[in-house]
Amino acid sequence: MPEIVDGYTHVLTERFFEDLTDKFGFQGLSGRPEFLWDHEQRKQDMVDYGVDKQIITLALPTMFQGMDHDLALDITRLANDEIRRLADEHPDEFIPVGTIPKVSGEFLAEFDRCVDELDMAGVQIFSNIDGRPLDDDQFWPLFERAEATDTPLWMHPQLWEWYDWASEYMEHRLFGWPFDTTLALSRLVFGGVMEEYPDLEIVSHHGGGMVPFYGRRIEMFYEQRMSYPENYQGYHEHAAELSQPAEEYFKKFNADTAVSGSTPAIDCAASFFNEGNVIFGTDYPFSPERGRQTIDYTIDAVDRMNADDETKADVFAGNLYDLID
């Protein structure tokens, strides 16, 4: 049995939840999501399915949407302290990743604290920040810091303003989150971020969204607009000048395997991004059976990949270690 490191899981601590609701008066969460801080059950689930370690990230990114700057900063500091504390209490099981939900001087300082003081393996950002795309000028200092410090960024999808009815069946998360992930990755490429910071490491959740499936469409779309600039004048006013074909920048991204146990989706991601950029991740504990199903199904899906045993072992653990070591 190869070593298995789950590269994208979500967690809260009870202390964080209590402070969030009592100290900070935040009322944006319904009920008490105790399954997110049942750490003993989490460790038992790991044992039962042979998972050796987990990357732990802050759950429920939607709490930050539209949140006041000062409140968000206080909550972010608390969250990162709690993630670090949890990893210190369970060093054999948990690898901590911080979270930066907004970008400003204070949040950039918090990024530095995550890297320099808290010794996080990486930092989680969101696919849009208060509705602003990731290639917005105000976010470039974060990418500059991340590249300079060799700090991988875990990118979690975030909600956005769209149709009011999209939330009725939760399509805004079912399909909206992979779509927003796709938008974010495309903005990083076409906005010139990946051109400026070629060594920037991004871990995209849920298999890289639509990017692997539409890889050839991405390239053809870009080539069409480059070949006939007179027909797409608005495009050229916004798109960055790229020194390589657009597809080459997309292939630099990493993608996790949190696609609900779909081997074809994982094979598609491995074919597009290349197998060295695919990282085992389950989205635990968000599945039936409080996360056990997603562990079970995702391990099985990787086992059934169209790849040799060495490649599968890299997906299960080696690729992540290459990223964070």
Predicted regions and their residues:
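Divalent metal-dependent hydrolysis catalytic cores, especially in the metallo-beta-lactamase
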Residues: Q27-M67, E93-T99, A121-I125
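Short aromatic-enriched loop/helix-cap "lid" or pocket-rim segments at secondary-structure transitions
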Residues: R15-L20, M67, E110, W165-E168, ...
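Short, well-ordered beta-to-alpha junction loops that form the rim of enzyme active sites
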Residues: T57-L60, T99-P101, H156-Q158, H205-G208, ...
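Catalytic pocket-lining loop regions of alpha/beta-barrel enzymes
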Residues: A87, E117-N277
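Mid-to-C-terminal alpha-helical segments outside catalytic/metal-binding sites
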Residues: P2-G7, V11-K53, D81-D88, A109-R113, ...
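Surface-exposed, active-site-proximal loop segments in enzymatic domains
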Residues: A59-L73, G105-E106, S167-E171
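Short glycine-enriched loops at secondary-structure junctions
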Residues: H10-V11, K102, P157-E161, P285-S287
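Aromatic- and glycine-enriched glycan-recognition loops and surfaces
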Residues: R32-E40, R77, D81, R132-F143
